From Swiss-Prot:
Disulfide bonds: none annotated. This is Zinc finger protein 823. GO terms for biological process: regulation of transcription by RNA polymerase II. Residues 4-97 form the KRAB domain. CDD domains: KRAB_A-box. It comes from Homo sapiens. GO terms for molecular function: DNA-binding transcription factor activity, RNA polymerase II-specific; RNA polymerase II transcription regulatory region sequence-specific DNA binding; zinc ion binding. Keywords: DNA-binding, Metal-binding, Nucleus, Repeat, Transcription, Transcription regulation, Zinc, Zinc-finger.
């Protein structure tokens, strides 16, 4: 049998890591060790250089002393073990304790795995002999250890250093065994594979923990505030919020932290160390988690999907915030409408929808924004100093995903296809809005009862109630409820028409107008009435047509209550109340309230000429 090194199978826990293990994980560790000792008692094996009898007795004593919980007064907290059944059944472990009060380090592992194992069928029971010489002494503790490999492992100082680096993602590990198990996740060759995302795991316990990211299971509940968590380590970190415990203090600035990983991340703010690099663009990060999030901007991976509206997210925190929008049950409540949010800043941002406050104003175009982050992203479009620059039009973007979306306006690429009808879209959001026409799901409901399939349409609709038009054209003073409409209107002044039809060379100020125009040449009519089968080139025409069947008249006059199928008809009607007459006949100077009335009036002049 080939020899197996200790590092091949060891799982090393620092004191901090051991403290984060759940009761079930510690119980699993204890059960594995007990099963190992039972195997040692009965199997017919002997070791080349060690006698198994004393090892059995030593392991039993050590297990009773050290595997239940870490004692602050007798252990430094580093354990070596957590050996899976498959390895336990093949190799008999050796357990070396360090009993000194200074160290108390537990060396629970397969120290004899460097030796070859022989099965001797001639022996019916374990032989019991005294241990031989213990030539290896720990430099710091002065403890004698009988096996060289145990000494080498024990000698490693518990400084939290992780000398084994993953070449694929730069994550570091304290042992070679941990690194190899991590590499299995990259190569997808672990025996436990997630059916939802395909991620592979070597350990069933890690696989079950991962499954909770999909199922949403949260078995650990805080007794003080009832908040639940999917992982025991997350639960312990949360408990420290209540206790105020911050055991890890920065030596440079004295700032304290509740957990070791946060402390390490903070230390890098002083050293400037950024050990984790993006393999695609080379950008460096101080934390591996941030590297993973960043890499998704290149791959487009969005593993968290909302079941209500289909929106997807790069990371779980954004997904959680989004879900609160649907449920409205966040811990921080709006004083005006009672809606709940996940954090105080979100409440403040929401309250601006009631007050209309938009403190961030762009001095170049007059656009006002509610949030500083939106303002910074917007300014990049003017300054052109964003890291992502379009080679065709020179427009700059601060975010790779926004840049990729913009590129599609030039290439015409439509990577998002509807599975039901095959229609393709350039944006994932456009696909979600389209899919709602099939499913009929409209999760965003207005107080007036009208529902919408997407948030932007809902927000635009809300301005029809408030009458708010914060976006004003500096050329003519015309105001708009949405910045998009102002941008489109501005092009009527500048005559900027960057989008040209390849068939007739007609130019348009907006890309969507070009796409609609192209249907004149292609004859495409993608919008079909379900009642009568009549097809239309534009969605607005279909919606207007459907009102013939439904009898719906959504535009109502506030003064007399008369309703109309189209907003244009309502505007014309309202002039009968105000007396406003904008349309003047050039023949006789008569003023009329609507264009239709003007055309009818002109016919009276034509009759006179005839």
């Amino acid at each position: 049998m080939d020899s197996v090194a200790f590092e091949d199978v060891a799982v090393n826990f620092t004191q901090e890591e051991w403290a984060l293990l759940g009761p079930s994980q510690k119980s699993l560790y204890r059960n594995v060790m007990q099963e190992t000792i039972r195997n040692l008692d009965c199997i017919e094996m002997k070791w080349e250089d060690q006698n198994i009898g004393d090892q059995c007795q030593n392991a039993k004593r050590n297990l009773r002393s050290h595997t239940c919980e870490i004692k602050d007064d007798s252990q430094c907290g580093e354990t070596f073990g957590q050996i899976p059944d498959s390895i336990v059944n093949k190799n008999t472990p050796r357990v070396n304790p360090c009993d000194s009060g200074e160290c108390g380090e537990v060396v629970l592992g397969h120290s004899s795995l460097n030796c070859n194992i022989r099965v001797d069928t001639g022996h019916k029971s374990c032989e019991h002999q005294e241990y031989g010489e213990k030539p290896y002494t720990h430099k710091q503790r002065g403890k004698a250890i009988s096996h060289q490999h145990s000494f080498q492992t024990h000698e490693r100082p518990p400084t939290g250093k992780k000398p084994f680096d993953c070449k694929e993602c730069a994550k570091t590990f304290s042992s070679l065994g941990n690194l190899r198990r991590h590499m299995a996740a990259h190569h997808g060759d672990g025996p436990y594979k997630c059916k939802l995302c395909g991620k592979a795991f070597v350990w069933p316990s890690l696989f079950h923990l991962h499954e909770r990211t999909h199922t949403g299971e949260k078995p650990y509940e805080c007794k003080q505030c009832s908040k639940a968590f999917p992982f025991y380590s997350s639960y312990l970190r949360h408990e420290r919020i209540h206790t105020g415990e911050k055991a890890y203090e920065c030596k440079q600035c004295s700032k304290a932290f509740p957990d070791y990983s946060t402390y390490l991340r903070h230390e890098r703010t002083h050293t400037g160390e950024k050990p984790y690099k993006c393999t695609q663009c080379g950008k460096a990060f101080s934390c591996y988690y941030y590297t993973r999030l960043h890499e998704r901007t290149h791959t487009g991976e969005q593993p968290y999907a909302c079941k209500q509206c289909g929106k997807t997210f790069y990371h779980h925190t954004s997904f959680r915030r989004h879900m609160i929008r649907h449920t409205g049950d966040g811990p921080h409540k709006c004083k005006i409408c009672g809606k709940g949010f996940d954090c105080p800043s979100s409440v403040r941002n929401h309250e601006t929808t009631h007050t209309g406050e938009k403190p961030y104003e762009c001095k170049q175009c007059g656009k006002v924004l509610s949030h500083s982050s939106s303002f910074r992203s917007h300014m990049i479009t003017h300054t052109g100093d964003g890291p992502q620059k379009c080679k065709i039009c020179g427009k700059a973007f601060g975010c790779p995903s926004l840049f990729q979306r913009h590129e599609r306006t030039h290439t015409g690429e439509k990577p998002y296809q509807c599975k039901q009808c095959g229609k393709a879209f350039s944006l994932a959001g456009s696909l979600r809005r389209h899919e709602a026409t099939h499913t009929g799901v409209k999760p965003y409901k207005c107080q007036c009862g009208k529902a919408f399939s997407d948030l932007s349409s809902f927000q635009n609709h809300e301005t029809t109630h408030t009458g708010e038009k914060p976006y004003e054209c500096k050329e003519c003073g015309k105001a708009f409820s949405c910045f998009k409409y102002l941008s489109q209107h501005k092009r009527t002044h500048t005559v900027e028409k960057p989008y040209e039809c390849k068939t007739c060379r007609k130019a348009f100020s907006h890309f969507s107008n070009l796409k609609v125009h192209e249907r004149i040449h292609s004859g495409e009519k993608p919008y079909e009435c379900k009642e009568c089968g009549k097809a239309f080139s534009w969605l607005t025409c279909l919606l207007r047509h459907e009102r013939i069947h439904t009898g719906e008249k959504p535009y109502e006059c506030l003064q007399c209550g008369k309703a109309f199928t189209r907003s244009r008809f309502l505007r014309g009607h309202e002039k009968t109340h105000t007396g406003e007459k904008l349309y003047e006949c050039k023949e006789c100077g008569k003023a009329l309230s609507s264009l239709r009335s003007l055309h009818r009036h002109k016919r009276t002049h034509w009759k006179d000429t005839l």
